[in-house]
UniProtKB/Swiss-Prot annotation:
The lineage of its organism: Bacteria, Pseudomonadati, Pseudomonadota, Gammaproteobacteria, Candidatus Pseudothioglobaceae. It is found in: Cytoplasm. Its cofactor is a divalent metal cation. Nucleotidase that shows phosphatase activity on nucleoside 5'-monophosphates. This is 5'-nucleotidase SurE. Its EC number is 3.1.3.5. Belongs to the SurE nucleotidase family. Binds 1 divalent metal cation per subunit.
Length: 249
């Protein structure tokens, strides 16, 4: 297959280098990634200026842009290639539970799905970042399986891999997203009290059996099918009822 690879940590990050090298053993890989770290960029697109792809080497490009920009331009712009699959990562750090709303890595995969391609995002679920090779093996195995399967249109697979050697992986689990508590308070900059840093993620709130949190804690690879339809269907009638009351009073 011909695979487009991107991320949100930047084209020089260890994770994307490991991902590209791992996939290149069996597939043709084209890397189009941000020129620098764009973590937590979510699905933002750059609309206020033009973007310039820069070729770094054969089949490796960087852009001063978000992950979604990179995937969008690669599929709708400068690449004259027929891409079969989009894979984003390997992210440095987990994308579990509510993280997926903010993640540029997940957003890059979602952009690929918006543009009609099967897409996967993969993250190494630790800030130690010691076992990217494990994640590389995992994604290669999954792609070999997916090539014989069918993902319904609009589905993105969000994959999180424990930061352990491959022989310590207990297996694969299909999971749902867990939930976090509210984020921690913003932090005042040590050198300038007029500046603030965004606070850390909230602690795990829903991490029971069946969640992505639970799988990772127990050394399983977590695979969560995602969709982009954010409609809360069971609230439609409730909202309609009080809207009707507003209209009639």
């Amino acid at each position: 297959m011909k695979i487009l690879v991107s991320n949100d940590d930047g084209y020089q990050a260890q994770g994307i280098i490991e991902l590209a090298q791992s996939l290149a053993q069996e597939h043709e890989v084209i890397v189009v990634a941000p020129s620098e770290n764009k973590s937590a960029a979510s699905s933002s697109l750059t609309l206020d200026k033009p973007l310039r792809p820069i070729q770094i080497s054969n089949n490796v490009y960087c852009i001063d842009a978000t992950p979604s920009d990179c995937v969008h331009l690669a599929l709708c712009g400068f690449l004259n290639e027929e891409i079969d699959l989009v894979v984003t990562g390997i992210n440095f750090g987990a994308n579990l539970g509510d993280d997926v709303i903010y993640s540029g890595t997940v957003a890059g995969a979602i952009e690929g799905r918006f543009l009609g391609l099967p897409s996967l995002s993969i993250s190494l679920a630790s800030w130690r970042g010691q076992h990217f090779k494990t994640a590389g093996i995992v994604i290669r195995q999954l792609i070999n399986q997916i090539s014989h399967a069918h993902l319904s249109y609009g589905t993105v697979l969000n994959i999180n891999v424990p930061d352990v050697i491959f022989s310590d992986i207990k297996g694969f689990q299909t999971t749902r997203l867990g939930k976090r508590h509210m984020s921690e308070q913003s932090v005042i900059d040590k050198n300038d009290s007029s500046l603030y840093w965004i606070g850390e993620n909230g602690k795990e709130a829903d991490n029971g059996v069946g969640t992505d949190f639970h799988a990772i804690t127990n050394h399983y690879v977590s695979i969560t099918p995602l969709q982009t339809d954010l409609t809360k269907y069971n609230e439609i009638n409730t909202v309609s009822t009080w809207l009707n009351q507003i209209i009639t009073t």
